[in-house]
């Protein structure tokens, strides 16, 4: 699947948040999103199957203007905020038996910016995480027709990574009298290291 979208005054995330943590948006003038999505599913054998999803994209603002040091500045062509150019995911399924199933899940998200001005302080680094899902089906043939036991190990390799955050700018008008200096900053949302989820499904 491919897409080619041109926008006039697209609403994009600024990277900033309001007083209660909601993300702010702004019109970005002319912009575009061009991409290719690839999905693939392969059954290697009666026991193994693989599913892959890849998204390649170019997400650009054509002319971004912003106030810098008290004057309007044209940043020109920049990356749209929170829009990585590469996202890939993969799942490997192993059917050990009719009742026991293992699924190894992987996801990669490329570098992205939290601003629309490509500021170094707004970069979110790429990350790669893996999960493991285990499911076991019991068929007691008594009270329940079946009992499904599910275990999910998130972030199997205990990776420390950041997937989201916020970015802001402010004008320093007090350090040097009569001069405006635009400064910036960022906050980050670290994700959980290895964690576990268990679930049960009872079918009558």
Positions of the model-derived regions?
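Asparagine-centered polar/low-complexity signal
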Residues: 1, 27, 53, 130, ...
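Gram-negative outer-membrane beta-barrel transporters
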Residues: 3-8, 24-116
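Extracellular/periplasmic, surface-exposed regions of secreted and cell-surface proteins
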Residues: 10-13, 25, 38, 198-203
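Solvent-exposed loop segments that connect transmembrane elements
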Residues: 12-24, 62-77, 166-186
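Conserved C-terminal beta-signal and adjacent last beta-strands/turns
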Residues: 78-204
């Amino acid at each position: 699947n491919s897409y080619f979208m041109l926008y006039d005054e697209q609403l994009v995330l600024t990277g900033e948040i309001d007083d209660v943590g909601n993300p702010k948006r702004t019109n970005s003038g002319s912009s575009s999103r061009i991409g290719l999505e690839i999905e693939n599913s392969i059954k290697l054998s009666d026991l193994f199957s693989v599913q892959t999803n890849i998204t390649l994209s170019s997400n650009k603002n054509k002319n971004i203007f912003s106030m810098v040091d008290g004057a309007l500045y044209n940043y020109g062509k920049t990356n749209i905020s929170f829009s990585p150019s590469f996202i890939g995911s993969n799942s490997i399924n192993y059917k050990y038996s009719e009742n026991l199933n293992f699924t190894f899940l992987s996801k990669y998200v490329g570098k992205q910016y939290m601003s629309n001005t490509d500021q170094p302080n707004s970069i979110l680094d790429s990350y790669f995480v893996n999960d493991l899902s285990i499911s076991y089906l019991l068929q007691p043939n008594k009270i329940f027709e079946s009992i499904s036991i599910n275990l999910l190990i998130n972030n199997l390799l205990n990776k420390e990574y950041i997937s989201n955050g916020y970015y802001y700018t402010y004008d320093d008008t007090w350090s040097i009298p009569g001069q405006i200096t635009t400064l910036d900053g960022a906050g980050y949302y670290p994700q959980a290291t290895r964690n576990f989820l268990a679930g049960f499904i009872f079918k009558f």
